[in-house]
Amino acid sequence: MPLLNSVTTPYAEALLQVVNENSQTEEMVSEVKQLLELVNDSPELEKALSSPILETDAKKKIIIEIFSNKVNSSLLNFLKLLADRQRIGILTSILDRFLEIYRENSNIALATVTSAVELTDEQKGLITKKIINIAGTEKLELVTKIDPSLIGGFVASVGSKVIDASLASQIRKLGLTLSK
């Protein structure tokens, strides 16, 4: 991915600079997350934006039509710039990189917690506190996923660290111990 990062980083940093100059950081981070979710949930939109067949003006028209009421003007202008520069096809990578740089600059760790069932707010709070201690950070962004194959418990990952407290893992370990 280093090659893609060399393309995405300048755009992500430019967006972050605009955001910081306009004191819109929290608002923009929220909008970028919503935009990423929207694009990731719509394969047709992603295909259209990355299509080499569609002209730049057509892509800009799509951007304006879909996003003009959903994002602020700075982000809308950024999307149009990406279309002009033929970079709208890597939009999700640029936005992911933007969030990555934002987290690095703000000392926010990103943790992914996968559980067998939906976690309650209390459980999320307890897991967040535990991960903050392990990660050695003051702030944490928690992404939750559901995987019924875990049977119970959870698997948390932050950076290169993984905490596997799932029932499926414990059953696997027990099976290995009994087979010896």
Curated annotation (Swiss-Prot):
Keywords: ATP synthesis, CF(1), Hydrogen ion transport, Ion transport, Membrane, Thylakoid, Transport. It is a peripheral membrane protein. GO terms for cellular component: plasma membrane-derived thylakoid membrane; proton-transporting ATP synthase complex. Its main location: membrane. Pfam families: OSCP. It is found in: Cellular thylakoid membrane. The keyword Ion transport applies. SUPFAM superfamilies: N-terminal domain of the delta subunit of the F1F0-ATP synthase (SSF47928). It comes from the Bacteria. GO terms for molecular function: proton-transporting ATP synthase activity, rotational mechanism. Gene3D superfamilies: N-terminal domain of the delta subunit of the F1F0-ATP synthase. Belongs to the ATPase delta chain family. F(1)F(0) ATP synthase produces ATP from ADP in the presence of a proton or sodium gradient. F-type ATPases consist of two structural domains, F(1) containing the extramembraneous catalytic core and F(0) containing the membrane proton channel, linked together by a central stalk and a peripheral stalk. During catalysis, ATP synthesis in the catalytic domain of F(1) is coupled via a rotary mechanism of the central stalk subunits to proton translocation. NCBIfam families: ATP_synt_delta (TIGR01145). F-type ATPases have 2 components, F(1) - the catalytic core - and F(0) - the membrane proton channel. F(1) has five subunits: alpha(3), beta(3), gamma(1), delta(1), epsilon(1). CF(0) has four main subunits: a(1), b(1), b'(1) and c(10-14). The alpha and beta chains form an alternating ring which encloses part of the gamma chain. F(1) is attached to F(0) by a central stalk formed by the gamma and epsilon chains, while a peripheral stalk is formed by the delta, b and b' chains. This is ATP synthase subunit delta. It comes from Prochlorococcus marinus (strain AS9601).
